[in-house]
C-alpha cells in the first residue's frame, strides 16, 4: 500500500515571502507622474471620447440604426432615429440619428459600439479628460459628439451632392460639398426661415 503524501500547512515561509516583495519595493525609485502639469501623449488607437463623423460634404454618417446602442454592454448609448426629407436632410440615406446621447457615467470605453457601427459614423478620439462634478454633464448629446466642420463642408441639414446617391457617399465619390450648397432650415429643431444665419 502506497503512503499518502503528508499535508503541509502554510507554515512561516509564505507570509515572509509575501512581505519580501513589499520590502524590495520600498527601495525602488517611485514612478510619479506630474499630472496634469506633464501629460503623456496617448497611443494613436487610444479609446477616448466618442465622435460622430461626417461625410466630406458635411452630411452626417449616422443613419440612426441603433446598432451601437444594442452592442453597448453598459447600456450607455441612447439613439432615436428619424426620416430624412428633401426639405431637411441630415444624412445621404433614408434615416438619420435625430437624438444621440452617450452617458459617460456608465460608459466603459470598450469600443464595442465602434465595431457595431455599419457606416463608420462612430469612432473614438484621444480625449480622455471626461471627469465632471455633475452627472447631468456626463451625458453627451449629439451636438457635443458631432465632428467639427472642415473648409469644404456645409453644416447639415442640406441637400445631397447633385447626381449622387447614398451608395456614392459610401464609395467615397463625394469629396466636398457641391458649389452653391446652402444649409437648409431645420424645422424639426424649431428654426424658421427668417432666423438669423439660416436661409430658406
Swiss-Prot record:
GO cellular component: plasma membrane
UniProt cross-references to NCBIfam families, sorted A to Z: NuoI, PRK05888.1-3
Source organism of the structure: Streptomyces avermitilis (strain ATCC 31267 / DSM 46492 / JCM 5070 / NBRC 14893 / NCIMB 12804 / NRRL 8165 / MA-4680)
Role played: NDH-1 shuttles electrons from NADH, via FMN and iron-sulfur (Fe-S) centers, to quinones in the respiratory chain. The immediate electron acceptor for the enzyme in this species is believed to be ubiquinone. Couples the redox reaction to proton translocation (for every two electrons transferred, four hydrogen ions are translocated across the cytoplasmic membrane), and thus conserves the redox energy in a proton gradient.
Cofactor note: Binds 2 [4Fe-4S] clusters per subunit.
EC number from the UniProt entry: 7.1.1.-
Bilayer topology annotation: Peripheral membrane protein
GO molecular function, one term: 4 iron, 4 sulfur cluster binding
Protein name per its UniProtKB record: NADH-quinone oxidoreductase subunit I 1
Alphabetical list of InterPro entries matching this protein: 4Fe4S_Fe-S-bd, 4Fe4S_Fe_S_CS, NADH_quinone_OxRdtase_chainI
Biased composition (Basic and acidic residues): 189-200
Gene: nuoI1
Protein family (similarity comment): Belongs to the complex I 23 kDa subunit family.
Protein's cellular compartments: Cell membrane
Domain called 4Fe-4S ferredoxin-type: residue spans: 52-82, 98-127
Keywords from the named record: 4Fe-4S, Cell membrane, Iron, Iron-sulfur, Membrane, Metal-binding, NAD, Quinone, Repeat, Translocase
Amino acid at each position: 500500500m502506497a503512503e499518502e503524501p503528508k499535508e503541509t500547512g502554510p507554515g512561516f515561509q509564505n507570509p515572509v515571502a509575501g512581505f519580501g516583495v513589499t520590502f524590495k519595493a520600498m527601495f525602488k525609485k517611485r514612478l510619479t507622474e506630474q499630472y496634469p502639469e506633464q501629460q503623456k501623449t496617448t497611443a494613436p488607437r487610444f479609446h477616448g471620447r466618442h465622435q460622430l463623423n461626417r461625410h466630406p460634404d458635411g452630411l452626417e454618417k449616422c443613419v440612426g440604426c441603433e446598432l451601437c446602442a444594442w452592442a453597448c454592454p453598459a447600456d450607455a448609448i441612447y439613439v432615436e432615429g428619424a426620416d430624412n426629407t428633401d426639405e431637411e436632410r441630415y444624412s445621404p440615406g433614408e434615416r438619420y440619428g435625430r437624438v444621440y446621447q452617450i452617458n459617460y457615467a456608465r460608459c466603459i470605453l470598450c469600443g464595442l459600439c465602434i465595431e457595431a457601427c455599419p457606416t463608420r459614423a462612430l469612432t473614438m478620439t484621444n480625449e480622455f479628460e471626461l471627469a465632471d462634478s455633475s452627472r447631468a454633464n456626463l451625458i453627451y448629446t449629439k451636438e457635443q459628439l458631432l465632428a467639427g466642420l472642415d473648409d469644404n463642408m456645409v453644416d447639415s441639414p442640406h441637400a445631397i451632392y447633385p447626381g449622387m446617391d447614398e451608395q456614392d457617399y459610401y464609395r467615397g465619390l463625394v469629396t466636398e460639398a457641391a458649389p452653391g450648397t446652402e444649409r437648409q432650415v431645420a424645422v424639426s429643431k424649431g428654426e424658421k426661415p427668417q432666423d438669423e444665419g439660416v436661409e430658406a
